[in-house]
Amino acid sequence: MRTHYCNHISATDIDKTVTLFGWVDRRRDHGGVIFIDLRDRTGIVQIVSDPQRTPTSYPIAETLRNEYVVKIIGQVSQRPPESLNPKIPTGEVEIYAESIELLNGVNKQLPFVVSSLEAELVKEETRLKYRYLDLRRDRMAKNLQLRHAVVKAMRRYLEDEQQFMEIETPILTRSTPEGARDYLVPSRVNPGQWYALPQSPQLFKQLLMVSGCDRYYQIARCFRDEDLRADRQPEFTQLDMEMSFMSEEEILDLNEGLVCHIFKAVKNIELPRPFPRLTYQDAMAKYGTDRPDTRFDLTLVDVSDIVKDSGFKVFSGAVKNGGKVKVLPIPGGNDIISNVQIKPGGDLFKEATDAGAKGIAYIRVKENNKLDTIGAIKDNLTEEQKRELLARTGAKPGYLLLFGAGDTDTVNKSLSRLRLVIGQRMNLIDPEKINLLWITEFPMFEWNADEKRLEALHHPFTAPNLADLNDLATARAQAYDLVYNGVEIGGGSLRIYQKEIQEKVFETIGLSLEEAYNKFGFLLEAFEYGTPPHGGIAYGLDRLVMLLAGEESIRDVIAFPKTQQASCLLTEAPASVDTKQLKELQVKSTYKPKVKEE
């Protein structure tokens, strides 16, 4: 039986006999003495096999190669001074192997060397295909351990300190398409009927509040059939929570306690409380996004009122058409950013146009506050407008002013993107800094131009601000998102718990009462049986762990992730199924593979 994990052996174990299991990370032969780095999920310890001191283990030690699986029994010894290795936790000790048992070898050539630093350069496709080897690597093993530690901290805080109950909700449920596409599962028992995999446990957790389970949580698997990005997967994990009889203020306070507990448990970092807050309106005005990275100070300035009557039609026309003109003032930007970068073909021009802008207007502030820009701007701004621009933006000599003009959404998207890119390039962002921020008072609805209707910004079960009930179309939501260094890690709201208000919200997004009862009748009926006021939040576990681990993709903190084509390279899922299975389900595929042209 194992007595220790590799990384847990220290100088306090000297002279003890230990039993270890693991993989051969490296094997070295130094003048007849064989050294083996033994690895398990915790780390590495050095094993020594000496033909004089440990003759019984030596013949097997000679045969070992990378990734062989072994059991080792040996005595812990102090390393000689010249062999000390301060780079690893076990660098003070080594184990003289009295017995080595080969449990399994490697029968094929390794696709990459697990222990080599070059494994970091291996293509991700190869790593995902041989994920069981990839997960042996130190970086990946640490990511999984961190994920476990985060979940453990969540459970301890919610259960031990806040009296939450962990309750599982169904994976097979009904399709209620609102937002992303559902993954559908045909029912063999009920031909022609379909289950859907849940996009979230939203409705069931609200029903649990009706049931009297007033503090619920779940580490929930969720499924969304949507286009993938670096921080999206078709199946993902949430910490899902719901609470009855709590105000928005109380929910935010409880969740700040949770997040602080996680950071202390896994990073030994004390976060200051309370977390700063910004309304959605203020966030969009200052940063152009509801997920601002507040680790650096560049902010947007609205100058629409100053330039609305200017002779420069790009500015005045934008305001006339109901849009905005905003500025990103960049201290020291004159020395860092060239005209080539801003003009067509430049990298910053491309960043802006990728976000929907037609281009970037600019003004450089020179000595004595002289303005350097293209003639069309310089000649069509009055001296008063120029003075007002400098005063409003606080610009001084050396500043570069980047302008966005057009519809408000495009201006915000393009300038917020430029703000982040420039902040990174000018090294304004401290990678060690942790800024957590609540965004509150979201709009209830946004306009869907394609479908020509309002749709819920979060979801249609979000409670409107009570002061806005008379005009739901423009109402603010009692909703809140938690943003960590510019990434949304959690979002929630108070919920509607009165049937009449829920019916009005459905009507506002274009659902008739008949449609609403067909899709959500079970929820509306439950509201007639004494539903308590309640609210909740869900955290993206994958995204949170990614940020804590310093990774750039959630695929590196998930044991067996999908690719950006929603496929598993290890198991080759998704895959076709035989016609017998389809026949049992009374399902027929109409897909016809495209014939490749010669």
Swiss-Prot record:
The keyword Protein biosynthesis applies. One of its GO terms (molecular function) is ATP binding. Keywords: Aminoacyl-tRNA synthetase, ATP-binding, Cytoplasm, Ligase, Nucleotide-binding, Protein biosynthesis. ATP binds at residues 224-226, 233, 488, 540-543. It is an enzyme of class 6 (ligase). Residues 202-205 are annotated as: Aspartate. It comes from the Bacteria. Its main location: cytoplasm. Its EC number is 6.1.1.23. The record marks 30 as: Important for tRNA non-discrimination. Pfam families: GAD, tRNA-synt_2, tRNA_anti-codon. The keyword Nucleotide-binding applies. One of its GO terms (biological process) is aspartyl-tRNA aminoacylation. SUPFAM superfamilies: Class II aaRS and biotin synthetases, GAD domain-like, Nucleic acid-binding proteins. It is found in: Cytoplasm. One of its GO terms (cellular component) is cytoplasm. L-aspartate binds at residues 178, 224, 458, 495. It catalyses: tRNA(Asx) + L-aspartate + ATP = L-aspartyl-tRNA(Asx) + AMP + diphosphate. Gene3D superfamilies: Bira Bifunctional Protein, Domain 2, GAD-like domain, Nucleic acid-binding proteins. Belongs to the class-II aminoacyl-tRNA synthetase family. Type 1 subfamily. Homodimer. PANTHER family: ASPARTATE--TRNA LIGASE, MITOCHONDRIAL, ASPARTYL/LYSYL-TRNA SYNTHETASE. Aspartyl-tRNA synthetase with relaxed tRNA specificity since it is able to aspartylate not only its cognate tRNA(Asp) but also tRNA(Asn). Reaction proceeds in two steps: L-aspartate is first activated by ATP to form Asp-AMP and then transferred to the acceptor end of tRNA(Asp/Asn). This is Aspartate--tRNA(Asp/Asn) ligase. It comes from Crocosphaera subtropica (strain ATCC 51142 / BH68) (Cyanothece sp. (strain ATCC 51142)). The gene is aspS.
